[in-house]
């Protein structure tokens, strides 16, 4: 995706709700009348949840919350009911991919630079160190070669490869979870190629 690309999505809330426009541009992200400068974006959390009436699944709600300058949040929500707008699952995935490619990779890269310069960084309660990962403040340091991770639909888990009971779980609908998982993936990949 080129830096000059502008991507727009038309989204609906509810069965007959009005359309809301989400625009990704080189210098800004805009949702309806709210515009955020790219430099101000600091984090994202997102999820898809089911709409249940009585015991029946009747639709899906797609939620994204983007944190930007001074801890302000932009909420983007759209949904589908009764099989209408089935394409929204693909739209949701496309929005997340576009957000990453155009904005969020830069946020993660800045955090990685801080980790390299300082030799430690705490994200979402997990401490990343040159020698490994500490899952909690009082926990032991798990060496990088023993750090494992598993990704699931709505969360991921970090664990000690030899002692799976030593682990931590993070929901994708939690602040800093995307940053943490991306840094773990990147560091593990870099260390695998160094061997």
Label each region the model flagged:
Residues 1, 11-13, 30-36, 94-97, ...:
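A generic short-segment signal for beta-strand/edge and adjacent turn/coil regions
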Residues 1-2, 195:
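Polar low-complexity intrinsically disordered regions
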Residues 5-11, 36, 74-76, 142, ...:
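Generic detection of short hydrophobic beta-strand segments and adjacent strand-loop junctions
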Residues 7, 19-22, 104, 111, ...:
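A generic structural signal for ordered alpha-helices
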Residues 14-54, 120-165:
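Phosphoinositide-binding peripheral membrane targeting modules
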